[in-house]
């Protein structure tokens, strides 16, 4: 009994003197492990006379419980001290000056797109949206694109294996809108479009805005008036404009719109800014609208083109290179 008591006292002193978790773990193994001294005492109970076993067993169990509690308490003390030391080393000096948050800004293409949408909203046009992954019907067939049209070629259009494609224009939204609404109607579709083309003035992905008006009395004069008002409102000045005959499968007659753009040297040159025309009767028929009763006009423009003109950017690719030095100019 005195041997167990003496062993317990020495062990408790060693536990209290342990300075690291590793030292404490070594003591636990030496005392309570499979080959530990307390465990050895338990194994020797069978060699004692029967009348001594009960008292010796109780003493050994009390010793084991006391050591287990002491080990747990010392472990908690060491862990708390280590945490306090780490927190003291990581203490934040609240008197140091803070870092100001960087102020963000809208991308110039986003600014331009919102400006275009806002102008047409004032003219009574409703904004509509549609999928960027289209089917052949909405992207080509319903818009009077014949099967042999060059726009269907692989070098102009990104096709998927199942026959679907990345939309080459937002005109498919017009088809969906006419399917869901009855004339008279005014709408614009804005979003990303995709074509296999990349150079200083073209990108394989760009943003487009297309507009559509259908009613019983619309004519080309209405179209010219609408686009003249839009150009004046967007650039906040008057331009001399001309409408050149051009071919688009979904309009007849079709035209491209040029504005007299002043160069840095003071000279003026004609600059193409958008395409337009009267909606082709076949397009109206494809969505169940009677072309004998209704007429309409449509127009489309590249958002990046207008952003380049508004901000004086010469290379379209600068909009997509994510150079903060470039983008910060427009924030």
From Swiss-Prot:
Cofactor(s) demanded: Mg(2+)
Listed PROSITE patterns: AA_TRNA_LIGASE_II (PS50862)
Signal sequence extent: none
InterPro entries membership: aa-tRNA-synth_II (IPR006195), aa-tRNA-synth_II/BPL/LPL (IPR045864), Phe-tRNA-synth_IIc_asu (IPR004529), Phe-tRNA_ligase_II_N (IPR004188), Phe_tRNA_ligase_alpha1_bac (IPR022911), Phenylalanyl-tRNA_Synthase (IPR002319), tRNA-bd_arm (IPR010978)
An annotated Gene Ontology molecular function: tRNA binding
GO CC list: cytoplasm
Database matches in Pfam families: Phe_tRNA-synt_N (PF02912), tRNA-synt_2d (PF01409)
Co-factor: note: Binds 2 magnesium ions per tetramer.
The enzyme's E.C. designation: 6.1.1.20
Keyword Aminoacyl-tRNA synthetase: yes
Disulfide bridges in this chain: none
GO biological process: phenylalanyl-tRNA aminoacylation
Entry superkingdom: Bacteria
Record's subcellular location: Cytoplasm
CDD domains per record: PheRS_alpha_core
Residues the record lists as binding Mg(2+): 252
The UniProt record lists the keyword Hydrolase: no
Catalytic reactions on record: tRNA(Phe) + L-phenylalanine + ATP = L-phenylalanyl-tRNA(Phe) + AMP + diphosphate + H(+)
Keywords: Aminoacyl-tRNA synthetase, ATP-binding, Cytoplasm, Ligase, Magnesium, Metal-binding, Nucleotide-binding, Protein biosynthesis
Oligomer status and interactors: Tetramer of two alpha and two beta subunits.
Family membership: Belongs to the class-II aminoacyl-tRNA synthetase family. Phe-tRNA synthetase alpha subunit type 1 subfamily.
UniProt-recorded name of the protein: Phenylalanine--tRNA ligase alpha subunit
Organism of derivation: Xanthomonas euvesicatoria pv. vesicatoria (strain 85-10)
Protein encoded by which gene: pheS
């Amino acid at each position: 009994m005195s041997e167990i008591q003496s062993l317990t006292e020495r062990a408790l002193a060693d536990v209290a003197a342990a300075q690291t978790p590793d030292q404490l773990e070594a003591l636990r193994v030496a005392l309570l492990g499979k080959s530990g001294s307390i465990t050895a005492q338990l194994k020797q109970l069978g060699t004692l006379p029967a009348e001594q076993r009960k008292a010796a067993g109780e003493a050994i169990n009390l010793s084991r419980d006391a050591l287990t509690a002491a080990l747990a308490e010392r472990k908690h003390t060491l862990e708390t001290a280590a945490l306090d030391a780490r927190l003291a080393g990581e203490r934040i000096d609240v008197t140091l000056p803070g870092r100001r948050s960087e102020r963000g800004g809208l991308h110039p293409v986003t600014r331009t797109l919102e400006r275009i949408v806002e102008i047409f909203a004032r003219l009574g046009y409703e904004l509509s949206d549609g999928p960027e992954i289209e089917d052949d019907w909405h992207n080509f067939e319903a818009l009077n694109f014949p099967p042999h049209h060059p726009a269907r070629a692989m070098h102009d259009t990104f096709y998927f294996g199942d026959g679907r494609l990345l939309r080459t224009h937002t005109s498919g939204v017009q088809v969906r809108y006419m399917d869901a609404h009855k004339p008279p109607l005014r709408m614009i579709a804005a979003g990303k479009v995709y074509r296999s083309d990349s150079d200083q003035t073209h990108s394989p992905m760009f943003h487009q805005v297309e507009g559509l008006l259908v009613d019983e009395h619309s004519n080309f004069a209405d179209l010219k008036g609408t686009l003249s008002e839009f150009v004046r409102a967007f650039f906040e000045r008057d331009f001399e404009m001309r409408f050149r005959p051009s071919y688009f499968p979904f309009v007849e007659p079709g035209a491209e719109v040029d504005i007299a753009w002043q160069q840095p040297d003071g000279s003026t040159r004609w600059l193409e800014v958008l395409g337009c025309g009267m909606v082709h009767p076949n397009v109206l028929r494809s969505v169940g609208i009677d072309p004998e009763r209704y007429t309409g006009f449509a127009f489309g423009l590249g958002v990046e083109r207008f952003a380049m003109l508004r901000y004086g950017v010469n290379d379209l690719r600068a909009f997509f290179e994510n150079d903060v030095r470039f983008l910060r100019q427009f924030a």
